[in-house]
Amino acid sequence: MVIIDSLSFYRPFWICMRLLVPTFFKDSSRPVQLYVVLLHILVTLWFPLHLLLHLLLLPSTAEFFKNLTMSLTCVACSLKHVAHLYHLPQIVEIESLIEQLDTFIASEQEHRYYRDHVHCHARRFTRCLYISFGMIYALFLFGVFVQVISGNWELLYPAYFPFDLESNRFLGAVALGYQVFSMLVEGFQGLGNDTYTPLTLCLLAGHVHLWSIRMGQLGYFDDETVVNHQRLLDYIEQHKLLVRFHNLVSRTISEVQLVQLGGCGATLCIIVSYMLFFVGDTISLVYYLVFFGVVCVQLFPSCYFASEVAEELERLPYAIFSSRWYDQSRDHRFDLLIFTQLTLGNRGWIIKAGGLIELNLNAFFATLKMAYSLFAVVVRAKGI
């Protein structure tokens, strides 16, 4: 059998975390601490703030939409990053649970399901995410390169700085460099943010289904009754790990997904409005089209895999009664009956964004409807 290693999918996430918060990994020297503090003050805090402050200066309509598009994206990115930093200890515990659950995959049917569904979906999602991030940052850096070689030192995004950029070319170059650097750091934050939730929900749904396969096969092999009863007790212990897994996931992604749903809906509306009314050059049009796709890629996988988790939890009682429980000992049947009653409560487990919005495909379509409604308001306000 092939060795299962689900944690390999998290390597890019931890690479981002090592770049952004090396102090979490016991690297607590004074220069490293100073690096982390400055990075989060200058980028996580000040970058979205200096974009938002520009909105108070009453810019033109085109500047307002261009600024607001990036402002909302960066505010959401910073908030999600801070939420992930707060939950890093729980994320480490989740990884230890995944590592334990991987060791329980034994039969050919389980390996086949893991290979064809869990591993395939996780790999497809991560590749799609990395390609989309790569495309948008390739276009971003190409646009910066074209701007610099043409001698244009204007800011990438209209923003507030406490000094006059027009009268001092050097300060203008510093401000432009700051925005480019901040966008690259925000890219690492965004990659970490958008990798974790869908990937973890995918693995949770997969391991719940794999447990159902094991449970459904119980009693169909030529084993003694005592052996089957012990296996039932082992599966109950595995179920406890799944319960802990589910609880930790619900807690660690709650705030992140609330920001995701609200931020994506507003950002999609503003991107479409800006493209229709203000984008004139081809590079910007392609950039914002890819940006629109990236925002959708951010939102859809989390909702899709959350729906899969809910469906797998609904099927747990059926998986238990699919086992050959009727040929087992009285103790086996009694334990299974009590256990089934407990799992019926799983059907009420719902992963919610911020404890308010149920996370599933309905939430994804509701967000798109919200974006369309906001866009309709903009169109009506423009008199089109």
From Swiss-Prot:
Q: How does it sit in the membrane?
A: Multi-pass membrane protein
GO cellular component terms attached to this protein's record: dendrite membrane; membrane; plasma membrane
Query: What GO molecular function terms would the record report?
Result: ionotropic olfactory receptor activity; odorant binding; olfactory receptor activity
UniProt keyword annotations, A-Z: Cell membrane, Membrane, Olfaction, Receptor, Sensory transduction, Transducer, Transmembrane, Transmembrane helix
InterPro entries, sorted: 7tm6_olfct_rcpt
Extracellular topology ranges: 57-63, 150-169, 273-274, 380-384
> TM segments?
36-56, 64-84, 129-149, 170-190, 252-272, 275-295, 359-379
* Cytoplasmic-side positions: 1-35, 85-128, 191-251, 296-358
Quote the subcellular location field of this record: Cell membrane
| GO biological process, any | signal transduction
Give the UniProt tissue specificity note: Expressed in the antenna and in a subset of 18 olfactory receptor neurons in the maxillary palp.
What does this chain do?
Odorant receptor which mediates acceptance or avoidance behavior, depending on its substrates. The odorant receptor repertoire encodes a large collection of odor stimuli that vary widely in identity, intensity, and duration. May form a complex with Orco to form odorant-sensing units, providing sensitive and prolonged odorant signaling and calcium permeability.
Q: Which family does it belong to?
A: Belongs to the insect chemoreceptor superfamily. Heteromeric odorant receptor channel (TC 1.A.69) family. Or2a subfamily.
Q: Any further remarks?
A: The atypical heteromeric and topological design of the odorant receptors appears to be an insect-specific solution for odor recognition, making the OR/Orco complex an attractive target for the development of highly selective insect repellents to disrupt olfactory-mediated host-seeking behaviors of insect disease vectors. Odor-evoked OR currents are independent of known G-protein-coupled second messenger pathways.
Q: Which proteins does it associate with, and in what oligomeric form?
A: Interacts with Orco. Complexes exist early in the endomembrane system in olfactory sensory neurons (OSNs), coupling these complexes to the conserved ciliary trafficking pathway.
Provide the protein name: Odorant receptor 33c
